[in-house]
């Protein structure tokens, strides 16, 4: 249980950092979705990779926007967290949103692997020719894990909320502390309330590790494919930096960035849930929450830099902003 009051300097630092992350996430994911949708309207068709990127950007845009809405709700209605229905509804919403965010990113890695990797295996070629169906099957199969996750969370929520209601002395004297703990613990919003959270950790970690493992396998297979391709180029005495090699490298950069950010996210999720004694130090708590929000927000800029169309669109926006700034300076605004 938490027993100390929040230091206002820590709370101020936490709030400023989180607001910057939220604004950055809204701009980043909103930009990806806007560029792809405008291109879709212009060309009247959209590629498979752009479909995945757009769905991923919209999912994370909603996630980041919901964080801002929840902050405003808790500021305007500080007694809102006492309602068990609100706890359950927000928990389910963030689980669903986080689920599709992670699995769509996994689908992106699998898509790059099947499109770029070169293997003569008949099963791989079968999947390569049916990459759209493979992605659809992955999404549909992930719904099974989503259902199990929601059911597990629902069962656990009943015990956690009951424990919270039965121990009103825990946070009724300091609702601000409960609000921040509840609000920014990602899809595990009630784990920091009771000391029994370590019981639920293996179940929650399982749902998190499944897409991570799939992405890791795709990443390793891409490395193996690049190694084979590089050896083939050496035998044929061709330039190592051919089109296929560059495609491998770009795909590896995209998948690796996801794995790195996701590994950091999982690390701090485990720290936040498992080491409850450590989390009594408010500095560690703040750092844990901020680190958890970095993953879905910072990944948008990795996607922009890794996609030629998005990168060119971002470069075209920057000169416009500079020109607008110069015009405003000229007008004395």
Swiss-Prot record:
PROSITE patterns: G_PROTEIN_RECEP_F1_2
GO molecular function: bitter taste receptor activity; G protein-coupled receptor activity
SUPFAM superfamilies associated with the record: Family A G protein-coupled receptor-like
Principal subcellular localization: membrane
GO biological process, one term: detection of chemical stimulus involved in sensory perception of bitter taste
Residues glycosylated per entry: 7, 167, 186, 195
Chain ranges on the Extracellular side, renumbered to this chain: 1-13, 82-90, 156-205, 275-281
Record membrane topology: Multi-pass membrane protein
Cell location: Membrane
Keyword presence, Transmembrane helix: yes
Segments on the Cytoplasmic side according to the record's topology features: 35-60, 112-134, 227-253, 303-333
Biological role: Gustducin-coupled receptor implicated in the perception of bitter compounds in the oral cavity and the gastrointestinal tract. Signals through PLCB2 and the calcium-regulated cation channel TRPM5.
Note, other: Several bitter taste receptors are expressed in a single taste receptor cell.
Name of the protein: Taste receptor type 2 member 123
Originating organism: Mus musculus
């Amino acid at each position: 249980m938490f027993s100390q009051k929040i230091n206002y300097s820590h709370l101020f630092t936490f709030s400023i950092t989180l607001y910057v992350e939220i604004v950055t996430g809204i701009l980043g994911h909103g930009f990806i979705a806007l560029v792809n949708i405008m291109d879709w309207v212009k060309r009247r068709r959209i590629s498979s990779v752009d479909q995945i990127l757009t769905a991923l950007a919209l999912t994370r845009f909603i996630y980041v926007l919901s964080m801002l809405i929840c902050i405003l709700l808790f500021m305007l209605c500080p007694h809102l967290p006492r309602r068990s229905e609100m706890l359950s509804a927000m928990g389910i919403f963030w689980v669903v949103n986080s689920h599709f965010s992670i699995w769509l990113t996994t689908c992106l890695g699998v898509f790059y692997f099947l499109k770029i990797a070169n293997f003569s295996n008949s099963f791989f070629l079968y999947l390569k020719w049916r990459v759209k169906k493979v992605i659809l099957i992955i999404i549909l199969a992930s719904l099974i894990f989503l259902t199990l996750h929601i059911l597990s969370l629902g069962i656990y929520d009943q015990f956690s909320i009951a424990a919270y209601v039965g121990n009103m002395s825990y946070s009724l004297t300091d609702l601000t502390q409960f609000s921040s703990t509840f609000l920014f613990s990602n899809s595990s919003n009630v784990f920091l309330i009771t000391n029994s959270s370590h019981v639920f950790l293996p179940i929650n970690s399982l749902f998190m590790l499944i897409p991570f493992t799939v992405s890791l396998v795709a990443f390793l297979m891409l490395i193996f494919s690049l190694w084979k391709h590089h050896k083939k180029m050496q035998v044929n005495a061709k330039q190592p930096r051919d089109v296929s090699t560059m495609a491998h490298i770009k795909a590896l950069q995209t998948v690796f960035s996801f794995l790195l950010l996701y590994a950091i996210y999982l690390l701090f999720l485990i720290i936040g849930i498992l080491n409850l004694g450590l989390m009594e130090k408010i500095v560690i708590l703040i750092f844990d929450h901020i680190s958890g929000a970095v993953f879905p927000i910072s990944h948008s800029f990795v996607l922009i830099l890794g996609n030629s169309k998005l990168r060119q669109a971002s470069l075209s926006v920057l000169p416009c902003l500079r020109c607008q700034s110069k015009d405003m300076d000229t007008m004395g605004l």
